[in-house]
Amino acid sequence: MSVIESHDLGLIAPRISEAGVADYVALLKPRVMSLVIFTALVGLLLAPGSFHPVLAITSILCIGVGAGAAGALNMWYEDDIDAKMTRTANRPIPRGKITRPEALTFGMTLAFFSVVTLGILVNWIAAALLAFTIFFYVVIYTIWLKRVTAQNIVIGGAAGALPPVVAWAAVTGSVSVEPMLLFAIIFFWTPPHFWALALFRAGDYANAGVPMLPVTAGPDATRLQILLYTIALVAVALAPWPLGYFSAVYGITSLALGGGMLACALRVYRHRTGSAALRASRNLFRFSILYLFALFAVLLLEVVARGVLALFG
């Protein structure tokens, strides 16, 4: 065999991407993205002052794209973890549909586009907050905290709580108490939501080497933390009503939803073994999603109602 023939046999043909549109959409974490867009929309509509509809749509799109960029960069870095977990093994990178360099390029491009577009077309305060949100989620949470501490989701949850603040800043060019109240609600909601998931996925996290609280401290300690954070969440979510920031309709809804959330958390705390424990943690995880959507939906409906009354009043 000639040297040339031997060399030719060693050549590796360039990889042709097998990714379709659906694979790139999956990189964006569309479920998380939808929650981000919804909470950001509430923050934007609650903000005082007039805002051109085109700028409002631009702001929400940029925040949504920024969230998608963070999701893509998260999957780029965590491909090794995703491949070991049943819940995430079907994501585009572990399946070989998208390579890590492709995911990195996609995520960085979207992050740059979302921040710069928001800055140029809306304002640079909102753009800076969006850039910080992406940085916090990707660098502080994904790259640093997630693999080293069981408090990863507590600290990292700040990134998921920032979209309403970004949206408020898009309208006003500043930050005030109201968006920080929304931030606090999402921040205290995050640990019970994700620890409930971690309780019935503890084996997955242990197999992947992720130090989630049920893996490092055990399920009983996790149940106690879920209960404590849920109590804090109910109090924080109710506080804007007596403080005069949100209406009685919001307050009553918050009280009712908080009662449901607390009841679910108490069941998780009490049922510690067998199918009852598994069912309790699953129910809390599902109800927590309903809780946050319903709570923010009430605020959204109040804004719409005020607008209708102002139009016809």
Swiss-Prot record:
GO terms for molecular function: protoheme IX farnesyltransferase activity. InterPro entries: Protohaem_IX_farnesylTrfase (IPR006369), UbiA_prenyltransferase (IPR000537), UbiA_prenylTrfase_CS (IPR030470), UbiA_sf (IPR044878). It is found in: Cell inner membrane. It catalyses: heme b + (2E,6E)-farnesyl diphosphate + H2O = Fe(II)-heme o + diphosphate. Keywords: Cell inner membrane, Cell membrane, Heme biosynthesis, Membrane, Transferase, Transmembrane, Transmembrane helix. Its EC number is 2.5.1.141. Pfam families: UbiA. It is a multi-pass membrane protein. The chain crosses the membrane at residues 35-55, 56-76, 98-118, 120-140, 153-173, 180-200, 226-246, 248-268, 292-312. The keyword Phosphoprotein does not apply. Its main location: membrane. The keyword Transmembrane applies. Pathway: Porphyrin-containing compound metabolism; heme O biosynthesis; heme O from protoheme: step 1/1. One of its GO terms (biological process) is heme O biosynthetic process. GO terms for cellular component: plasma membrane. Converts heme B (protoheme IX) to heme O by substitution of the vinyl group on carbon 2 of heme B porphyrin ring with a hydroxyethyl farnesyl side group. Belongs to the UbiA prenyltransferase family. Protoheme IX farnesyltransferase subfamily. Carbon 2 of the heme B porphyrin ring is defined according to the Fischer nomenclature. This is Protoheme IX farnesyltransferase. It comes from Rhodopseudomonas palustris (strain BisA53). The gene is ctaB.
